[in-house]
């Protein structure tokens, strides 16, 4: 049994603060078990004092240090990452989540990186029933809208939808 329901990785980032504030306003510190994580203890304490309360645990880690990431990945059901660029900081995190049966979500708009994740982690995640959910935010809207418009034009001109779209 994992100790936390969700941990926000990158809680001191602009979006991380918004996610932290939302979770606290929606659930407080007792309806679900959650924590915040990032690189800088001072910044995380500031976020916690501004938008949450002192009962929300803090984890410190470095995106390139597996051991520090595992200290919180192993303890939660879900990692919500707001740390980008994801192609630089996210691959190791996703790999460790899949290896440790932890679900993962992010707000990436990096379609090329999502393809890399699918190629590298989809089968193992699927076999373990681990969810990897990318683009859970505003950043995904431009690419989603582009695909939508391309598909509409394909249907109008060629009477069929594109089977795939490379970006």
Question: What are these model-predicted stretches?
Answer:
Residues 37-41, 62-63:
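N-terminal Rossmann-fold cofactor-binding loop
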Residues 85, 96-114:
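ADP-ribose/adenylate-binding Rossmann-like module
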Residues 5, 77-78, 103:
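Structural motif
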Residues 108-130:
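Rossmann-fold NAD(P)-binding glycine/threonine-rich loop
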Residues 133-139, 143-167:
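Conserved anion/nucleotide-ligand pocket segment
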Residues 4-26:
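N-terminal Rossmann NAD(P)H-binding glycine-rich loop of SDR-like oxidoreductase domains
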Residues 60-89:
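Conserved Rossmann-fold cofactor-binding substructure of NAD(P)-dependent oxidoreductases
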Residues 46-55:
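Short, conserved SAM-binding/catalytic segment
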């Amino acid at each position: 049994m994992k100790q936390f329901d969700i941990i926000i990785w990158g809680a001191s980032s602009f979006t991380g603060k918004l996610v932290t504030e939302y979770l606290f306003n929606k659930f407080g510190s007792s309806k679900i078990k959650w924590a915040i994580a990032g690189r800088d203890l001072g910044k995380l304490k500031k976020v916690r004092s501004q938008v949450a309360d002192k009962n929300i645990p803090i984890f410190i880690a470095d995106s390139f240090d597996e051991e520090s990431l595992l200290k919180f990945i192993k303890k939660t059901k879900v990692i919500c990452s707001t740390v980008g660029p994801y192609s630089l900081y996210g691959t190791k995190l996703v790999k460790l989540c899949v290896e440790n049966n932890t679900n993962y979500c992010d707000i990436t708009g990096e379609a090329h990186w999502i393809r890399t994740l699918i190629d590298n982690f989809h089968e193992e995640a699927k076999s373990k029933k681990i969810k990897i959910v990318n683009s859970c935010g505003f950043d995904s809207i431009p690419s989603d809208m582009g695909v939508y418009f391309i598909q509409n034009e394909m249907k109008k001109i060629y009477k069929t939808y594109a089977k795939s779209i490379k970006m």
